[in-house]
Curated annotation (Swiss-Prot):
It comes from the Bacteria. The keyword RNA-binding does not apply. Belongs to the HupG/HyaE family. Keywords: Plasmid. InterPro entries: NiFe-hyd_mat_HyaE, Thioredoxin-like_sf. It holds the Pfam family HyaE. This is Hydrogenase expression/formation protein HoxO.
Length: 161
């Protein structure tokens, strides 16, 4: 095997460590740690919520920037939403991301009274974040995006008529 092809087989570096700025969301900004076992209880608190799915900070370093901006966005909107942080273990993040139809990290999943509203994926400029959050807080709830497999009835005919 050549050295060039071996480079492509090297594992992608990751870390299980939680960056301090993400820990501060829970310790100083009243965010809650959330996983697949606690999400329904957290959502039962009602109102507007933002679930932060950070991803691995080595693979997705912008998650640290989003963690810094999130409490500032909360303040701009007069604490108009609660913050949940997906537990850092990948299996927790993946289950929550799949449930709410987001595959990109980091993601801010907007929920209202337990139902999906919208998602903002990746880091944005401040003005764009403010616009997108304002839009999300005004949107009605909807179904989370799916993986794109069409749902059809077994009894459906071959045409649309």
């Amino acid at each position: 095997m050549s050295t060039e092809s071996a480079m492509f087989l090297a594992p992608i570096p990751t870390t299980d460590a939680v960056p301090p700025v993400i820990e501060r969301l829970v310790e100083q900004h009243q965010a809650a740690w959330v996983d697949q076992d606690s999400i329904d209880d957290w959502l039962a608190g009602g109102g507007d919520c933002v679930l932060f799915i950070a991803g691995d900070p080595v693979r997705f370093p912008e998650c640290v920037d989003v963690a810094v901006v999130l409490p500032e966005l909360q303040r701009v909107f007069f604490n108009g939403f609660r913050i949940g942080v997906a537990k850092r273990e990948r299996e927790h993040e993946d289950v929550l991301a799949n449930r709410f139809g987001t595959q990109r990290r980091p993601s801010l999943v907007f929920l209202r009274d337990g139902a999906y509203v919208s998602v903002i994926a990746g880091m944005r400029d401040w003005d764009e974040y403010v616009r997108e959050v304002r839009r999300a807080l005004a949107m009605p709830t909807s179904r989370p995006p799916s993986i794109g497999i069409p749902v059809i009835s077994a009894a459906a005919g071959g045409s649309c008529h």
